[in-house]
Regions:
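Cyclic nucleotide-binding regulatory domains
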Residues: 7, 32-90, 98-102
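A small-molecule sensor/coupling module
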Residues: 15-16, 81, 101-141
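Conserved active-site beta-strand element of glycosyltransferases/polysaccharide synthases
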Residues: 94
């Protein structure tokens, strides 16, 4: 199960509807760059189809796929990414503009709280797995919401069906 789903686990259906409307579908072909190392990222990406290679200095360090979230570090820090993300084949992601998210957070405190909590749990889990060794397992506390997160990812994909690609 993709750990990026952690973020969707804390969101509500109304949040998914907003994300699907605020974002734009990005269809990528093989070897297309979604995020370029060292270049500003203005979107937060939710992978909805296919897989992407995460590359540092041209060397693949990870593979991400459906359910993963990309650009989250640049979203939090507003710094250029330290890695590139490249489509491994035909792939699709929902690109939600950072500016739109921040504006919605100003209007909707409850959404902002849910989103930032989910992002904090996601980043905490990532840090814990790096410092304690990643055994591929999710924390027991996260298992309670992971089925909800999977359902939410499927709902997001359904909401995007037929959406025009960028």
């Amino acid at each position: 199960m993709r750990k990026g789903l952690i973020i969707l686990g804390d969101l509500k259906d109304q949040d998914l509807i907003w994300l699907s409307r605020a974002g734009q579908v990005r269809d990528c072909s093989a070897n297309e760059i979604l995020i370029a190392e060292g270049r500003d990222v203005e979107d937060l990406f939710f992978v909805t189809e296919g897989s992407f290679a995460v590359r540092v200095g041209g060397r693949e360090v990870a593979e991400v796929g459906v359910g993963d979230v990309l650009g989250e570090m640049s979203f939090v820090e507003k710094r250029p990414p330290s890695a590139s993300v490249v489509a491994k084949g035909s792939a699709r992601a929902l690109a939600v503009p950072r500016a739109a998210l921040l504006e919605e957070f100003r209007r909707n405190d409850a959404f902002a709280a849910r989103f930032y909590r989910a992002l904090a749990v996601f980043l905490s889990d990532r840090l814990r797995s790096m410092t304690e060794g990643d055994d591929g397992e999710l924390d027991e506390g996260l298992l309670d919401t992971i089925h909800v997160a999977g359902d939410r990812m499927l709902r997001l994909i359904d909401l995007l069906e037929g959406a025009p690609a960028a």
